[in-house]
Amino acid sequence: MLKARVIPCLDVKDGRVVKGVNFVDLIDAGDPVEAAKAYDAAGADELCFLDITASSDNRETIFDVIARTAEQCFMPLTVGGGVRQVADIRKLLLAGADKVSINTAAVKNPDFVAEAADKFGNQCIVVAIDAKKVSGAGEADRWEIFTHGGREKTGIDAVEFARKMVDRGAGEILLTSMDRDGTKAGYDIALTRAIADAVRAPIIASGGVGTLDHLVEGIRDGHAGAVLAASIFHFGTYTIAQAKAHMAAAGLPMRLDSSGDRP
């Protein structure tokens, strides 16, 4: 069985972390490179940067952030936000990203995913899916894709879309439950499992983590290959080491061998 991965996520806007990271010894909690270095030292398996810069004029800042992070960190780096064309992916990979996450552009043009996977390899193409439950009480579970930060309904079935994306070459699915995001009530396990069981690519579960048990549930019950969380790590509620130790104690296979993440 593949080892489960723990992935912190940083929202970056105009080169700054939007939700500050509460590491005591950080010189500048708003500097994504400082935050990334802290997570690298703490034993995170990967790191996700989400560039939420509104203006395309400021896109160059994320390339600088990635380049500086890649120089100083050894964990794989996934970058998403504003990826619309092959040239964007090329620039991100050249800057030092290991994987690139495609969201709205994949919904608008599924063939873009196939083109990207063909050019760069499916191992570095992640498709980010934001899904909301649309089925009512007593109906079979059904989720739809939403875009533009969960504001725009597409009418596209989330499970079918995930299948299509993996068929087109996505090497991984970053799955966020819009219903659970920010609630600290745990992942939408039914959604996560439905998509994990429908595709042959790993699922990164996202949205709703409030406790360490939620991380265990994402892997054990949701069949995800990785768990993503933000606030529980950023604000010091739990450390990466505590998360991994808790997951290992629950019987999940974890990477616990680096100096930064020994329980």
Swiss-Prot record:
Sorted UniProt keywords: Amino-acid biosynthesis, Cytoplasm, Histidine biosynthesis, Lyase
Q: Where in the cell is it found?
A: Cytoplasm
Tell me which residues this entry annotates as catalytic: 11, 130
GO biological-process terms attached to the record = L-histidine biosynthetic process
A GO CC annotation given for this chain: cytoplasm
The GO terms describing molecular function are: imidazoleglycerol-phosphate synthase activity; lyase activity
Q: What does this protein's UniProt record list under function?
A: IGPS catalyzes the conversion of PRFAR and glutamine to IGP, AICAR and glutamate. The HisF subunit catalyzes the cyclization activity that produces IGP and AICAR from PRFAR using the ammonia provided by the HisH subunit.
Record's subunit section: Heterodimer of HisH and HisF.
This chain belongs to which protein, by name? Imidazole glycerol phosphate synthase subunit HisF
Originating organism: Mesorhizobium japonicum (strain LMG 29417 / CECT 9101 / MAFF 303099)
